[in-house]
Amino acid sequence: MKLIDLENKYKDISDRVYKKLESSGHPNYLKRFNHSLSVARKAFYLANKHYNDEVLSEKAFLAGLIHDYCKYVKENEYNKVIKDNNLNIIYDERVRSVYHGMLAPYFIRNELNINDEEILKAIEWHVTGRENMSPLEKIIYVSDILNK
């Protein structure tokens, strides 16, 4: 599948990511949205170049597109997810950037109805990385760093 085909296929998701970021009221929401598009494109490129796997390439594009979906979520929304899911986490504003990855799967499942565990894990670990990362996790981690 070509990149343009994926951009068309996931136009609705892209629009929803844009609206989520815009609704945050954060002054950098447009920059963040453009970053997400860049990460999606880079992830697609890396998956094609290093794995030549159409399924992985599509997952890489989608994961890149939504990886910062929760970047500007308010503290009370994070705390609600933590409480509602009985997570053993205490929110700390000093490490806020870690939470948008860690808690993103909960928001993405509920708001975007994306349940692919491989995609959700790649998003969960895109900030910190971890040992024994899957190919998709590595692709999203590296794509995000390359697009800072």
Predicted regions and their residues:
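A short, charge-rich alpha-helical start-of-domain segment used by transcription regulators
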Residues: 30-33
